[in-house]
Amino acid sequence: MPEEVHHGEEEVETFAFQAEIAQLMSLIINTFYSNKEIFLRELISNASDALDKIRYESLTDPSKLDSGKELKIDIIPNPQERTLTLVDTGIGMTKADLINNLGTIAKSGTKAFMEALQAGADISMIGQFGVGFYSAYLVAEKVVVITKHNDDEQYAWESSAGGSFTVRADHGEPIGRGTKVILHLKEDQTEYLEERRVKEVVKKHSQFIGYPITLYLEKEREKEISDDEAEEEKGEKEEEDKEDEEKPKIEDVGSDEEDDSGKDKKKKTKKIKEKYIDQEELNKTKPIWTRNPDDITQEEYGEFYKSLTNDWEDHLAVKHFSVEGQLEFRALLFIPRRAPFDLFENKKKKNNIKLYVRRVFIMDSCDELIPEYLNFIRGVVDSEDLPLNISREMLQQSKILKVIRKNIVKKCLELFSELAEDKENYKKFYEAFSKNLKLGIHEDSTNRRRLSELLRYHTSQSGDEMTSLSEYVSRMKETQKSIYYITGESKEQVANSAFVERVRKRGFEVVYMTEPIDEYCVQQLKEFDGKSLVSVTKEGLELPEDEEEKKKMEESKAKFENLCKLMKEILDKKVEKVTISNRLVSSPCCIVTSTYGWTANMERIMKAQALRDNSTMGYMMAKKHLEINPDHPIVETLRQKAEADKNDKAVKDLVVLLFETALLSSGFSLEDPQTHSNRIYRMIKLGLGIDEDEVTAEEPSAAVPDEIPPLEGDEDASRMEEVD
């Protein structure tokens, strides 16, 4: 591994770095690259660009490769010399290239890079020892570049970043064609000489470069030899290393012993340590996304997915596509089988898509690449148009990235729709990622319609299976104009709710929404397929009815008008109004909310927020509406009791009790559960015939608060029984 630069009598020329170059170095180191390890990415990227260039030239002139057919990149750490060397067999540089590219012709950084791109410049040459090269000084105190172009002699460039660099003809080891970059590492950067660290950085940043990257390491192994051979070994050691890099010559030693066993059975052997050069290719996983999807097997996709994500399970679905035209990029997207446990954690990185530019890894946490609701998608996007040295700030402004994002979202939705045709797999997908789809409906107005087609819910007619809104619409009655839904905590709770009684009795299907995120979802999803979504827990529920039903409703309103007024007076500010219900069958009453207020379920969710905004709570927890069932015996008897004596204290007590019970059954919480409990206990006492005045010794007399109106005597008790 000769890395020394031979100084002959040749002329050494010294050049000053241009001031702009010094500024550029400062800009690169301080602005774009906070982590030092990217120097390796930049140098490998430069090597890859140089290899691209010679490969391109060889297409029209195969003789260009006479100086070296193999296109490769070698990495050679040398702990003794504290150097890290990268060798490529790319196009190399002439003396003029070396002087111009590495120091005397300034580039004004990113701006020039973007302008050159828009002007149609050869993208691979811009990266070649342009901006990225200087990142070598993050880890190196001195850099030596030895290069050989087919059209020129071999030259060496050297600089310790002190404002100047030298160039001279190099008469050291001929490199054929290409470039050798020798980094003399700073004392505190020797980690980049370690096998583990180099492998880690290459895997992270340059795993999918299109040329083999080989790591050369000097290692030791034990070798068994006889005493007689020990002396010979010393002399032959270097030759053997070259002839046999991978295998020790133990078999040869063994056969010698067998040959000599007749002469000297007691010949001794001993183990010595020999040094050898170990070669390991670091990027065996080739960029699968650059291949034709028709040529790739599911097993290959599976292997790539596991190497990309470190997942132990296979992926659920895959989408492999390329976009060409004004913009060119390829993408490979995977849906995992299960959601990660921290899918919605704030501190977690926002997405799992790795962004590459021409097979060079740029970043894996680009927020602009995919919307947050699709953050479970894993994969890679490889752009041909973005500049290699792009920063996060530039990505936010990039029009190219906006187009890429739009295409990714479109392809993800296509993938979900394809998956929906396979019921078994879609069920697994929906269990894991339904929250993401609903979040998408809340956030992504452009794709809301397509996302709504992917939703699945239990309904009053679907049994144990979930159904889509499209299937619901196909089953709607001719007279039905709306999609009816109810939100709540569980399927059992909403199925037995008072709100769905009449709707179900009339044969209309009700969608059961039982996840907290459904509340946010339906705030944005006002209609589906031209049918409005109507909550059965809010005021203004209109069911299709014939003339007879309308007439009956009008009669009920007139008959119970006085009771409604009385109940409103008793409940006062607790309710906004009391009305006759068209939604109840077996329940005496229920609490509904205003059309734009929160449902009981939403109120429960918001109260559970640790960082809730109490000012919002005030007006969104809208006044409640009490609806009473005119066909229920409790309500009818209460009407008769009120007609007889509207000042009857028992009527007041029963109205409050009905209201509080309706609050609970409608999914609300009580502001004062203790008062409600005491009211119930008194009813129990009445039912058991216990005298109100009998207070046990243990029972504190203050147990019944003053504000609860006392129930009347036995006469009222008998009336209570009538109600029962």
Curated annotation (Swiss-Prot):
Transmembrane segments: none annotated. ATP binds at residues 46, 88, 107, 133, 392. Residues 2-214 are annotated as: Interaction with BIRC2. Residues 225-244 have a biased composition (Acidic residues). GO terms for cellular component: aryl hydrocarbon receptor complex; axonal growth cone; COP9 signalosome; cytoplasm; cytosol; dendritic growth cone; dynein axonemal particle; extracellular region. Pfam families: HATPase_c_3, HSP90. Keywords: Acetylation, ATP-binding, Cell membrane, Chaperone, Cytoplasm, Glycoprotein, Membrane, Methylation, Nucleotide-binding, Nucleus, Phosphoprotein, S-nitrosylation, Secreted, Stress response, Ubl conjugation. Residues 2-527 are annotated as: Interaction with TP53. The record marks 126-127 as: Cleaved under oxidative stress. Residues 620-723 are annotated as: Interaction with NR1D1. Glycans are attached at residues 434, 452. Its main location: cytoplasm. GO terms for biological process: cellular response to heat; cellular response to interleukin-4; chaperone-mediated protein complex assembly; chaperone-mediated protein folding; negative regulation of apoptotic process; negative regulation of proteasomal protein catabolic process; negative regulation of proteasomal ubiquitin-dependent protein catabolic process; placenta development. PROSITE patterns: HSP90. The modification N6-acetyllysine is found at residues 435, 481, 624. Residues 215-552 are annotated as: Interaction with AHSA1. The modification N6-methylated lysine is found at residues 531, 574. The modification N6-malonyllysine is found at residue 399. The modification Phosphothreonine is found at residues 297, 479. The TPR repeat-binding motif mediates interaction with TPR repeat-containing proteins. NCBIfam families: PRK05218.1. Molecular chaperone that promotes the maturation, structural maintenance and proper regulation of specific target proteins involved for instance in cell cycle control and signal transduction. Undergoes a functional cycle linked to its ATPase activity. This cycle probably induces conformational changes in the client proteins, thereby causing their activation. Interacts dynamically with various co-chaperones that modulate its substrate recognition, ATPase cycle and chaperone function. HAMAP family: HSP90. This is Heat shock protein HSP 90-beta.
